[in-house]
Regions:
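C-terminal capping/lid region of NAD(P)-dependent oxidoreductase domains
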Residues: 205, 283, 288-297, 305-325
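Glycine-rich beta-strand-centered segment in the early N-terminal region that forms part
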Residues: 19-34, 46-89
Length: 325
C-alpha cells in the first residue's frame, strides 16, 4: 500500500506492506483521511504521545470500507461496511482501528471526505463539552479557538445540548464573523483586552460555566477571569503555548476545576466508552444533518505536502481532507 512515512529527509511517500489486524482490530481500506493540527508535528518528526520519529505514518482519523476484522471484533462490524474511525497512521491506503472506535457512517449518502473529518472532532468535543464541561440546558459554555474544525463542532454540541450562552473566540475577523452560523451567541477576539468583560456582560457578571480551552498559553489567567465561581476549564489544546504564567490566587478564589484531557494516555477501554457516550448523545443529530463541519479543501494523498502546508498556513475554515483514490 502507499503511505506517507516520516524519514530523516522528511515525509516521503513509499510502498509498505498492508498491516494485519490484531484480535480486536479492524483493517480499514481508507477512502479519505481527515487532517488535524497534531499531524504537523508528527510529520516534522516530533513525538505525539507514544508515536513519532522515523518510520511513523502520521494521521489520526479517516473513513473507508472494512477490509478485515480481527477474531475478537464484535459481529456488528463486517467486511464491506462503510465506516469512519479515529485511529493512528491514517496517511495511507489502509489503517488499523480498535473496533470500539469504528462507527458506521451516519448517512448512507455522506461523502468519504466529510466522514473522514468527523471522528476526532466528535469524540474530543463531546468528551470536553458534555462529559467534563457538564453542558446542560441553560449552561453558559465558551470554546477558545472556536474557528478550528474541532472548535466549530464544540459550538454545535453546546447548542445541541441546550446551552443558552455559547461563546466562541477567534482572532481572525473573517472567521469570527462566521461563528454564529455554528451556534455561537457571542464571538470574541482574545486580542481585544475587553473580551473578558464581554463574556461577563453576556453572563450577568458571573462568567461561563465551562471553558473548553484549545489555546492555553498567555490567555490562561484571562480565561480564569471569564469563568464563574465553581466553574470548569477543560484543557484540550495548547495552540498558544504549553507554558505560561498562571494566576493561582484567582484560580483558588474562583474555586475553578482545571481539567486536563488528552487521548494520548487513554486506554482502549476509556476511548471505547468516550465513543459510546458520543454516539448516545450525538448520533441522531448526525443522521439528521444538524451536526456538520465545513470542508475547506480536499487534496489527494499524493499531495500530502501541499495539504500540510495549507493547514500550517492557518488560512482554512473548517476541516481539510485527503483522498486516496
Amino acid at each position: 500500500m502507499k503511505a506517507a512515512i516520516v524519514t530523516a529527509q522528511g515525509l516521503v511517500l513509499q510502498d509498505v506492506p498492508v498491516p494485519k489486524p490484531g484480535p480486536q482490530q479492524v483493517l480499514i481500506k481508507l477512502r479519505a483521511i481527515g487532517l488535524n493540527r497534531a499531524d504537523l508535528g508528527v510529520a516534522a518528526g516530533h513525538q505525539h504521545g507514544p508515536v513519532g520519529g522515523p518510520g511513523t505514518i502520521p494521521g489520526l482519523e479517516g473513513a473507508g470500507e472494512i477490509a478485515e476484522c480481527g477474531s475478537e471484533v464484535p459481529s456488528h462490524l463486517k467486511p464491506g461496511m462503510r465506516v469512519m474511525a479515529s485511529m493512528g497512521a491514517t496517511y495511507a491506503e489502509y489503517a488499523l482501528a480498535d473496533w470500539g472506535r469504528v462507527s458506521l457512517l451516519p448517512d448512507a449518502n455522506m461523502s468519504w471526505e466529510v466522514a473522514a473529518t468527523l471522528p476526532i472532532a466528535l469524540q474530543t468535543m463531546h468528551n470536553a463539552v458534555v462529559t467534563h464541561g457538564l453542558c446542560a440546558p441553560g449552561s453558559a459554555i465558551m470554546i477558545q479557538g472556536a474557528s478550528s474544525g474541532v472548535g466549530l463542532m464544540g459550538l454545535q454540541i453546546a447548542r445541541l445540548m441546550g446551552a443558552s450562552v455559547v461563546v466562541g473566540s477567534s482572532t481572525n475577523p473573517e472567521k469570527r464573523a462566521r461563528l454564529a452560523e455554528f451556534g455561537a451567541t457571542l464571538a470574541v477576539d482574545t486580542n481585544d483586552p475587553a473580551w473578558v468583560k464581554q463574556v461577563l456582560d453576556a453572563t450577568e457578571g458571573r462568567g461561563v460555566d465551562a471553558v473548553v480551552d484549545q489555546i492555553s498559553g498567555p490567555l490562561v489567567s484571562q480565561t480564569l477571569a471569564a469563568t464563574r465561581v465553581l466553574g470548569r476549564i477543560i484543557n484540550v489544546g495548547r495552540l498558544g503555548g504549553a507554558v505560561a504564567d498562571f494566576d493561582f490566587d484567582l484560580h483558588a478564589a474562583r474555586r475553578i476545576s482545571y481539567i486536563g484531557v488528552t487521548f494520548r494516555t487513554r486506554s482502549n477501554e476509556e476511548v471505547r466508552e468516550i465513543v459510546r457516550l458520543m454516539r448516545q448523545d450525538l448520533w441522531a443529530a448526525l443522521e439528521a444533518g444538524t451536526l456538520a463541519l465545513p470542508l475547506d479543501r480536499v487534496f489527494h494523498l499524493d499531495e500530502v505536502h501541499a495539504a500540510l502546508a495549507h493547514m500550517k498556513a492557518n488560512a482554512h475554515f473548517g476541516k481539510i481532507a485527503m483522498v486516496t483514490g
